[in-house]
Amino acid sequence: MEYSEEGWMDQADSFPPRLLAIFFALFDPLQGPIVACEAPAGSVTNVDGGKNCLLPFETISDYVIPKRELCNKTITVCTNHYQVIGHPISIIGSNYERNALIFNMCMIFHEEEDSACYIPLVKRLARNLEVLEKQIHYISDLNKRPVIFSVIEQILEDMNNFCECMIQLDDQNSINIKLFPVFPSPPTVKSFHVPILTAQLDLLMDKNWDMTVQKVYPFINGINSVQRIAELANVSYRSCQKCMEHFLYYGCLIIADIFQFHNIYAMTTNAPNLLQDPDFQRECTAYVSTNSSNAKNVTFATIFKLYCSLRQGLRVKDWMNENKEIFKGLDVRRLISFGTIKGLIYRVHKYPYLERRTMRNNLTEEEKKLLGLLDGKHHFDELCVTLKKSPKVVNEMIAGLGDACFIYV
């Protein structure tokens, strides 16, 4: 399996989602849930006749100012094609009417936006306001309400323009918030995966970096598998795997398959979409060409012709023999890796399934291990790395265990 540069991190391209409005709500002992202030004006109230109202506060008031049992938890409400994120706070005290103060500073986004990056920010704002109320009665003091309005106005403007905000409330208190993109957890890195660096870590690394990272980095060359890197660096496989997942999370590397001449590849449906991009063509030609004199004659048309000649059932070894003359000036390993990374071609994996086992009792430990993997769920790369054997030897071992069929996916 390959994870492209444009793959699981795509959602960062839309970062940050636009903040449409902010409002501050609280529970009034006489009126119940009310909006104390909002920005822009009329976002959730009818102060301007409802012209700019995104959603009426009455429709969400029970969620924004909930029962005490639901306070101190992040809430998200989706209605009228908008989503509201808040973190209601309940402060218990005999100095308050009804012995409690409940308030919530909420943010509004379009419903389809991924607003996960704002959740930590909303929580922090809520906790800051809670501390300010406990220290200087920042919320319950009616004389300070205008200050809250100016605060939410500045937050709205600064977050949309700069993704961060610093507000000095007085000599001792301030609000400092900043947005950071939230990425999903990276795919689990397997022992047979081959990491390919996309950043020059040697320019970033210093003596304070994690020791395991410093050990494994020199062996990340686009050829070694994760298992092999762990062995060469003399670190545990689990530690090496964690390093690769961290690099993958921060976009420092991508994952590809082990390159072997028995591999099979085929074209994807994405290939025609890339033909009209001249920058892509230049990048491809520069990446897959060797330093030999023959490289001067390499064109993208030649490269694309080679990609088109890949098909189901054709091994890389046989593919090269069919196109001996065309391959002059090209690096086949880089040609395959570029094609898989960019989505031009995909790997056709080979999954062995043991249909009928030979009745033998004197199985070796390696054969017993292999027997447990012949269920059609483990492809050849995994078998070779697990057993530390070549594809040829693994094929011979499978043949010795009984009748097997191979599933190509």
Swiss-Prot record:
Cellular component GO terms, alphabetical: cytosol; GATOR1 complex; nucleus; vacuolar membrane
GO molecular function, one term: GTPase activator activity
Keyword match Cytoplasm: yes
Locations listed in the record: Cytoplasm; Nucleus
Keywords: Cytoplasm, Nucleus, Transcription, Transcription regulation
Transmembrane segments: none
Taxonomy, superkingdom: Eukaryota
Main location: cytoplasm
Cystine bridges: none
InterPro entries the UniProt entry points to: NPR2-like
A single GO BP: positive regulation of autophagy
Family: Belongs to the NPR2 family.
PANTHER family recorded: GATOR COMPLEX PROTEIN NPRL2 (PTHR12991:SF10), NITROGEN PERMEASE REGULATOR 2/TUMOR SUPPRESSOR CANDIDATE 4 (PTHR12991)
Function: Mediates inactivation of the TORC1 complex in response to amino acid starvation. Post-transcriptional regulator of nitrogen permeases.
Protein name: Nitrogen permease regulator 2 homolog
Taxonomic lineage: Eukaryota, Fungi, Dikarya, Ascomycota, Taphrinomycotina
